Amino acid sequence: KCDFGSYQAPYLILSPRKFGKTTWWRNFVVEAWGDASKGLLISCGTESGFHALDNLQVEEALEWDAEYDEETDHRGLVQIIDDLIDNNKEYGIKGVCFDTFDTLYDIAAAETLRICRKETGKNCKSLLEAWGGYNRGPERIVKLIQDQLTRLYRAGIAVFILTHTKFKERTDPLTGEKYEQLTNLMQDRTYSAIADNAQMVIVGTLERNING
């Protein structure tokens, strides 16, 4: 039987908005591990696609690093993963799914700016100027994400990442002709840093027939 947690790499699920990625995860958990309690959806930042679904174990990570707040009943993504790793013998979680890559990136970006201000003592306003520029800001974001994913891999927990797709205009390097390519919503460098090491990349599409 396939052990999804034996691969130290994520599974990426790409599709257009409203495709049903979160529903897919809800159904997959029961199919793969027999019980909804074996999977955890981490809804990142402003993502809120889980509210209409039942039989789904979910926790919201509105920030990257934040201690539990009794008033809001929320904690940071790092604290969620800390809890998983420390107590998973009790929880029995087999797989974690991040919903979505772009909102995961957003909370990591906010944390990166906070770290930059703390380390440099400067009022860093954008990722492009973080640590003097030269792409150091985006590189730190990727490292933050990869570090947390690695913690889950090493704990034997399968990692899935949901992300959106869009059409991007490309130019053929030989002919110079422009064409559209269905691809991810992220910047190429950020996406490649995760996707190039993925165990599997699954792309869902919607086909519509309009009559009349």
At which residue positions do the language-model features occur?
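A solvent-exposed, charged loop/short amphipathic helix patch at secondary-structure junctions
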Residues: 106-140
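Catalytic-core regions built around general acid/base machinery
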Residues: 144-156
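Well-ordered, non-membrane alpha-helical segments in soluble/globular domains
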Residues: 74-81, 134-146, 180-188
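Phosphate-binding/switch region of NTP-binding enzymes
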Residues: 6, 159-212
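Short secondary-structure boundary/capping segments
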Residues: 57, 112-113, 175-178
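Loop/turn-to-beta-strand initiation segments
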Residues: 92-95, 154-161
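Short acidic/His/Gly/Ser-rich catalytic and metal-binding motifs that mark active-site loops
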Residues: 50-51, 104-109, 113-116, 168-173
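Conserved P-loop
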Residues: 1-98, 102-107
